């Protein structure tokens, strides 16, 4: 399944240009509900270096109009950090980029997954130049109303080890690779 060309106009940052946009590609390597083990923890595949470009583009994509979020010059003079403020769910960009295409946490990309709940806690704003490492922990796995739920906790630390944010992400997932294949090939 090719990514529609109309999405290309939204691809502006260097990270976006290299981000795999078609989640149907490589789904065979994604972790499934059956594969996931509660308590399993590990680092994401990639780190994420925070840039003004990343924050500005995400804020604009969210429809923000506050000059503290979309006008770098205004933010330099008026923001408490002297930098653009981030949209509260900017952390999801870090997660999707960092998780990569194989290993723990990749179930977040699974074709057919549904997102019934998420909770994000911002401990302190990300700053330009910070190198963010994401640690993924499978925190819960259960069946409710006949549907397989999986929850992971993502902790985002900067290069100094300071915890910057936490994201509890829950998805209803296809249980097995065969279930994912039925959805992906439909």
Enumerate the language-model features and the residues they cover.
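Hot-dog-fold acyl-thioester-processing enzymes
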Residues: 2-117, 178, 182-186
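HotDog/MaoC-like acyl-thioester-processing domains
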Residues: 1-34, 122-186
């Amino acid at each position: 399944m090719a990514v529609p060309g109309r999405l290309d106009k939204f691809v502006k940052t260097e990270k976006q240009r290299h981000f795999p946009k078609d989640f149907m590609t490589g789904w065979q390597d994604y972790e499934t509900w059956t594969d996931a083990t509660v308590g399993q923890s590990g680092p994401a595949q990639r780190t994420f270096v925070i840039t003004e470009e990343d924050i500005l583009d995400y804020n604009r994509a969210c429809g923000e109009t506050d000059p503290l979020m979309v006008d770098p010059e205004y933010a330099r003079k008026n923001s408490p950090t002297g930098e653009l403020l981030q949209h509260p769910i900017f952390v999801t960009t870090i997660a999707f980029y960092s998780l990569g295409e194989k290993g723990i946490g990749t179930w977040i990309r699974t074709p057919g997954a549904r997102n019934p709940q998420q909770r994000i806690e911002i401990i302190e704003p990300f700053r330009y130049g910070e190198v963010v490492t994401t640690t993924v922990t499978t925190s819960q796995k259960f069946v409710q109303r006949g549907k397989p739920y999986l929850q992971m906790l993502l902790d985002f630390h900067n290069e100094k080890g300071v915890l910057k944010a936490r994201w509890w992400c829950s998805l209803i997932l296809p249980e097995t690779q065969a279930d994912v294949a039925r959805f992906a090939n439909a």
